[in-house]
Regions:
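N-terminal glycine-/serine-/threonine-rich beta1-alpha1-beta2 phosphate-ribose binding loop
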Residues: 1-81
Length: 81
């Protein structure tokens, strides 16, 4: 399985909330083996409220990385959102 890491200013946003399902659906259709496994955000929470990075990670079954360097080391692919 190839792992994907998400990098964003804050992670609880439209792209990060929708891409995991789209990637999973595409993998099922094509037989590819990718998974959103890691996330890192510069800001812990959107300015208008919402999930913290840790809460988002719990919701999506993703590991929160403490640094962008950690995410880069662990991920096979990186999506900058």
């Amino acid at each position: 399985m190839k792992t994907i890491g998400f990098v964003d200013f804050y992670i609880d946003e439209w792209h990060a909330n929708n891409y995991p399902a789209w990637i999973e659906e595409t993998c099922k259709k094509t037989g590819a083996d990718f998974k959103i496994a890691y996330a890192w955000a510069e800001s812990d929470r959107p300015p208008e409220g919402g999930l913290s990075t840790a809460e988002w990670c719990d919701k999506f079954g993703v590991k929160k990385c403490d640094t962008v360097e950690e995410l880069c080391e662990k991920s096979d692919y990186i999506l900058v959102l």
